[in-house]
């Protein structure tokens, strides 16, 4: 009897995580002589533990499955669930019993750092149980903070969204003749990759965003005041971009200056509010108009500004995962290997998931100016290829068409 595929999505959604899902489904269906049915976890490993899954082979037979590539967020539904550290916990018995009942031979988990932790634990339990199930991680995160890969699916589209949206914000913020400051808060708890993309919004006629602050460089309120004062001497309207996770020299988040931060299911501090805090600070110190803007969810899941390059690479990563599993690989994550020899090109490799999970790739310090307020041209060379091409969306009655999510079925 042919072994079946089980695929899940976990963590924060992106504009292209469903492209990776499409890649897994397509490659699985293409290998009909080796693979039986493709199943999907509904709401990740947490939902699967509750008995929620979907037959994706049937979906592919009856619906335009390629529409996944223009559907944002997580088609299968997501979760933020940590498997127990104790590999002897009964939850693993339940999982592997269910795998056996469903004749699962290959498990693919699409996600970021914590999702790779899930792949690591499952592959280690498989060794203990002498199971031949193969577990492969497919990278996903707008934060671009996974180690051992040039970049991650989702980041290119977020960078494109940030740059495009900032260009429009800048035009709006600078159209008045009176001094003003606009502070844009972007995602990024410990790594500033998302905020760095704001530099792409600059034009030959405007240097805005004039100041860019990221978690990798300690934030100082007095230095911020001096830098903003200097910027206002050069520009009537100044746009400032900040990562949600900017912190002072003592490691205290700027958002905590106003309120204590909440904690999510993984124990990570939920950071919002540094933009609003800085807005009030600027109003008090400078006495000029100031507003703060949180780009919030659209920066991670807007498909209308998705990068065609990102969509294509995400799909290929999903396909590469199936190929790797069929070749006998397990406990690995698909990696992106850049080759700039003859222009931009990405090759797909593999890395041990244990070398990836619970580690974090920070934005390179050498790509941040000494005063911590700007980004170097090296980053621009790095990111430009990732944002190329435009998503071709489908429309009905003037609004985008998406594939109906699994959790609504």
Name every feature range the model reports, one short phrase each:
Residues 51-105, 114, 142, 153, ...:
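Glycine-rich oxoanion-binding loops at beta->alpha junctions
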Residues 4-7, 68-81, 140-150, 177-180, ...:
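Gly-rich Lys/Arg/Thr-decorated short loops/hinges at beta-loop-alpha junctions or inter-strand turns
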Residues 14-24, 48-49, 92-93, 113-121, ...:
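Short glycine/serine/threonine-rich phosphate/pyrophosphate-binding segments
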Residues 1-53:
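N-terminal phosphate-binding or glycine-rich loops at protein starts, especially the Walker A/P-loop
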Residues 255-409:
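C-terminal non-catalytic interaction/assembly regions of soluble proteins
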Residues 4-14, 74-80, 105-111, 137, ...:
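Short glycine-rich or small-residue beta-strand-to-loop segments that form or flank ligand, phosphate
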Residues 10-12, 41-46, 80-81, 112-113, ...:
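Short, ordered loop/turn segments at secondary-structure junctions
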Residues 98, 109-111, 117-126, 130-132, ...:
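Accessory alpha-helical/coil subdomains and C-terminal extensions
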């Amino acid at each position: 009897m042919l072994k079946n595929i089980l695929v899940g999505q976990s963590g924060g959604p992106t504009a292209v995580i469903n492209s990776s899902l499409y890649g897994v489904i397509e490659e699985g269906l293409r290998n009909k002589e080796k693979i039986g049915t493709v199943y999907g976890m509904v709401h990740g490993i947490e939902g699967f533990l509750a008995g929620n899954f979907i037959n994706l082979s049937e979906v592919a037979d009856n619906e335009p499955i390629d529409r996944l590539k223009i559907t944002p967020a997580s088609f299968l539904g997501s979760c933020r669930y940590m498997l127990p550290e104790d590999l002897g916990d009964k939850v693993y018995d339940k999982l592997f019993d269910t795998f056996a009942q469903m004749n699962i031979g290959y498990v693919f988990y699409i996600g970021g750092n914590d999702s790779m932790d899930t792949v690591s634990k499952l592959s280690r339990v498989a060794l203990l149980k002498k199971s031949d199930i193969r577990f492969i991680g497919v990278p996903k995160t707008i934060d671009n903070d996974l180690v051992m890969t040039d970049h991650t699916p989702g980041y290119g589209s977020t960078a494109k969204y940030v740059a495009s949206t900032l260009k429009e914000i800048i035009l709006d913020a600078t159209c008045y003749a009176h001094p003003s400051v606009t502070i844009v808060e972007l995602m990024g708890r410990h790594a500033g990759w998302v905020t760095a993309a704001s530099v792409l919004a600059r034009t030959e006629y405007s240097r805005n965003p004039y100041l860019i602050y990221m978690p990798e460089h300690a934030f100082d309120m007095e230095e911020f005041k001096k830098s903003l004062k200097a910027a206002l001497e050069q520009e009537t309207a100044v746009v400032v971009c900040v990562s949600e996770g900017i912190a002072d020299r003592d490691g205290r988040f700027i958002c905590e200056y106003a309120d204590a931060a909440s904690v999510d299911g993984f124990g990570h501090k939920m950071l919002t509010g540094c933009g609003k805090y800085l807005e009030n600070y600027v109003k008090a110190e400078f006495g000029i108009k100031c507003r703060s803007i949180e780009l919030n969810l659209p920066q991670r899941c807007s498909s209308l500004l998705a990068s065609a390059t990102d969509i294509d690479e995400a799909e290929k990563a999903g396909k590469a995962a199936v190929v790797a599993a069929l070749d006998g690989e397990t406990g690995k994550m698909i990696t992106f290997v850049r080759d700039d020899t003859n222009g931009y090109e990405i090759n797909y490799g593999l890395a041990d998931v244990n070398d990836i999970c619970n580690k974090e790739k920070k934005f390179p310090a050498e790509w941040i100016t000494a005063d911590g307020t700007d980004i170097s041209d090296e980053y621009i060379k790095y990111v430009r290829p990732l944002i190329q091409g435009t998503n071709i969306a489908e429309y009905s009655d003037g609004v985008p068409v998406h594939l109906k999510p699994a959790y609504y079925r």
